[in-house]
Amino acid sequence: MQFQGAFTALVTPFRNGEVDEERYRALVEWQIEQGINGLVPCGTTGESATLTHQEHKDVIRICVEQVKGRVPVLAGAGSNNTREAVELTRYAKQAGADGALLITPYYNKPTQEGLYQHFKAIAAEVPMPFIVYNVPSRTGTNLCPETLARMKRDIPEVIGVKEATGNLIQVSEIIEYCGADFQVLSGDDFTVLPLLAVGGCGVISVSSNVVPAKMSELCRAFFEGDLATARRVHYEIASINRAMFLETNPIPVKTALSMMGRIELELRLPMVPLQPANQSRLRDILSAAGIV
């Protein structure tokens, strides 16, 4: 399975404390209409940390049902509890997801050997394509390129990484050690174009919740060799990328989507609404970009 191009890390819309299935299905449709290359339910942007297990499963199921095979679905299924990660990954496979996005265990801060054994154990229970998610700013642990290379060698299910350090030296080492067939996706919207330039294959994006066509255009232009267009789009969406991180993700992106009329603005604690000053800044940025 090739996960290439622009994938959106979908928000999970809520209404009155429950998953808003109608708005979620509409978001999936809009993303596909806008030319997105793939979708990721139940990632960080989807507030997976505050979904119940049943909601987590429901969101994956709804996404797969609505996509109907038109684009790949890479389902968030990670946990810092290996047994729980096995359960969620098994459900993702049963629901028909094309692959699983598995975050490195967080809070318990395993060693590199512990990280290796975690993913090996999941693969032994649920053989399906995995993209490992490395985001040290949230997990407190960095998955080293050498460990990824060992996983790639020993665990066939590990076919790539979502690399969110923003560190192009580390990205380059991953590609050097793992080879060109290892799928390296940006987990940092600011460095999509540089990551593609050193051999990456795409992005799992927050910003593409708001500008799916632009993020898809950036990736497509790069792969078609149209570097001028890729560079132009990179700078066109720079202000959007900054806006999506005015406060902790997914607070700004859900606020933006509510301003666009696509979802109700509802977050789950401990996420709280965007500060008023940042709401004004966000609206100004979206207005300048012609989005609202």
UniProtKB/Swiss-Prot annotation:
Listed SMART domains: DHDPS (SM01130)
BP-aspect Gene Ontology terms: diaminopimelate biosynthetic process; lysine biosynthetic process via diaminopimelate
Family assignment from sequence similarity: Belongs to the DapA family.
EC number: 4.3.3.7
Pfam families, per database record: DHDPS
Species this protein is from: Nitratidesulfovibrio vulgaris (strain DSM 19637 / Miyazaki F) (Desulfovibrio vulgaris)
Lineage: Bacteria, Pseudomonadati, Thermodesulfobacteriota, Desulfovibrionia, Desulfovibrionales
GO cellular component: cytosol
Residues forming the catalytic site: Y133 (proton donor/acceptor), K162 (schiff-base intermediate with substrate)
Domain of life: Bacteria
Protein name: 4-hydroxy-tetrahydrodipicolinate synthase
Compartments in which it is found: Cytoplasm
Sorted UniProt keywords: Amino-acid biosynthesis, Cytoplasm, Diaminopimelate biosynthesis, Lyase, Lysine biosynthesis, Schiff base
Quaternary structure annotation from Swiss-Prot or TrEMBL: Homotetramer; dimer of dimers.
Gene3D superfamilies found in the cross-reference section: Aldolase class I
